[in-house]
């Protein structure tokens, strides 16, 4: 997609070198927006393969209000493993090798990388096999799904923001309050990772549903391709339920950054030419957005260039 490649190019040419929480370092810009017409095809990278089923299972995980990586691992989705693993290795229950700064060390030390990978595999297996262990160390805190589906009020009640949003689109589509927030300041200290994609708003006009996302922190190479596809999919799912066509997905970013250890991968991607976008295929079976399974969602005509691997910064 040209919009995304333009973002990569802009940050490479105009970004500012900054330090960051992970110690990796970034090239960053502040305030950037992309627009995608969802009528023109499903917005997923074609200049590198994005594993769409991982996008699907993560979004369904959010929709279920789940915050435990066990569901993700059951669907061969490893994208949240590092944050749960980090919590485990910092606990008194962990008795293995020192895992301090495991992400950076694994990138720089091949011997340590083997040790880390072995510990991670043991951790994943135990999450899948031991329910009590999973309940304790698979939890990531009150992240996205919890805030979307079960926001706790000061009175101790809960708000299902997503269900309320869908009902409001049906009954008051002209509302300017079609908003869901994952940013709950009270819960931030107890989250494995505070929400990067923190707030989204829907807009209805001319029989079409559009979505705008505000993302406070945008990992351009690894995270943003997932975010674009995830919120485009969410827009399609909600539009189906409320009887509207899809309009635009607008992606507004605060700190949009390229990690310093992703620069060569970005240059490789920029050398490639975008292909035709695929079409989203949804099963007619699910009655509501909350009834979808991974098998109910697929892409037709997705023929991307090969994947480009890059390290994740934790």
Swiss-Prot record:
Compartments, record wording: Cytoplasm
Keywords from the named record: Cytoplasm, Methyltransferase, Nucleotide biosynthesis, Transferase
BP GO terms, sorted: dTMP biosynthetic process; dTTP biosynthetic process; methylation
GO molecular function: thymidylate synthase activity
Catalytic activity: dUMP + (6R)-5,10-methylene-5,6,7,8-tetrahydrofolate = 7,8-dihydrofolate + dTMP
Active site per UniProt: 196
GO cellular component assignments: cytosol
Residues given in the record as (6R)-5,10-methylene-5,6,7,8-tetrahydrofolate binding sites: 219, 313
InterPro entries assigned: Thymidate_synth/dCMP_Mease (IPR045097), Thymidate_synth/dCMP_Mease_dom (IPR023451), Thymidate_synth/dCMP_Mease_sf (IPR036926), Thymidylate_synthase (IPR000398), Thymidylate_synthase_AS (IPR020940)
Pathway: Pyrimidine metabolism; dTTP biosynthesis
EC number(s) on file: 2.1.1.45
Binding-site list for dUMP: 21, 176-177, 216-219, 227, 257-259
Top-level EC class: transferase
Known function: Catalyzes the reductive methylation of 2'-deoxyuridine-5'-monophosphate (dUMP) to 2'-deoxythymidine-5'-monophosphate (dTMP) while utilizing 5,10-methylenetetrahydrofolate (mTHF) as the methyl donor and reductant in the reaction, yielding dihydrofolate (DHF) as a by-product. This enzymatic reaction provides an intracellular de novo source of dTMP, an essential precursor for DNA biosynthesis.
PANTHER family for this protein: THYMIDYLATE SYNTHASE, THYMIDYLATE SYNTHASE 1
HAMAP family, sorted: Thymidy_synth_bact (MF_00008)
Quaternary structure and interacting proteins, as annotated: Homodimer.
Family assignment from sequence similarity: Belongs to the thymidylate synthase family. Bacterial-type ThyA subfamily.
Record-given protein name: Thymidylate synthase
The gene coding this protein: thyA
């Amino acid at each position: 997609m040209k919009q995304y490649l333009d973002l990569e190019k802009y940050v490479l040419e105009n970004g500012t070198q900054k330090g960051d929480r992970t110690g990796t370092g970034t090239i960053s810009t502040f305030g950037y927006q992309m627009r995608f017409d969802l009528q023109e095809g499903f917005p997923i990278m074609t200049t590198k393969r994005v594993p769409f089923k991982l996008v699907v299972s993560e979004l369904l995980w959010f929709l279920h209000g789940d915050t435990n990586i066990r569901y993700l691992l059951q669907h061969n989705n490893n994208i949240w493993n590092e944050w749960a693993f980090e919590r485990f290795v910092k606990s008194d229950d962990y008795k293995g090798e020192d895992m301090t700064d495991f992400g950076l060390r694994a990138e720089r030390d091949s011997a340590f990388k083997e040790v880390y990978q072995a510990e991670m595999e043991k951790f994943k297996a135990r999450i899948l096999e031991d329910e009590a262990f999973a309940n304790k160390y698979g939890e990531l805190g009150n992240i996205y799904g919890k805030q979307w589906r079960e926001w706790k009020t000061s009175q101790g009640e809960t708000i299902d923001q997503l269900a309320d949003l869908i009902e409001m689109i049906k009954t008051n589509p002209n509302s300017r309050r079609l908003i869901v927030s994952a940013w709950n300041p009270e819960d931030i200290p107890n989250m494995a990772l505070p929400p990067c994609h923190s707030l989204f708003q829907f807009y209805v006009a001319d029989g079409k549903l559009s979505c705008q996302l505000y993302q406070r922190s945008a990992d351009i190479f690894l995270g943003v391709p997932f975010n674009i596809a995830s919120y485009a999919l969410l827009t399609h799912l909600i539009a189906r339920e409320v009887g509207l066509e899809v309009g635009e997905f607008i992606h507004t970013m605060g700190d949009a950054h390229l990690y310093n250890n992703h620069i060569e991968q970005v240059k490789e991607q920029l050398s490639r030419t975008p292909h035709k976008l695929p079409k989203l295929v949804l099963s007619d079976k699910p009655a509501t957005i909350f009834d979808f399974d991974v098998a109910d969602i697929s892409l037709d005509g997705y023929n991307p260039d090969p994947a480009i691997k890059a390290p994740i910064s934790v």
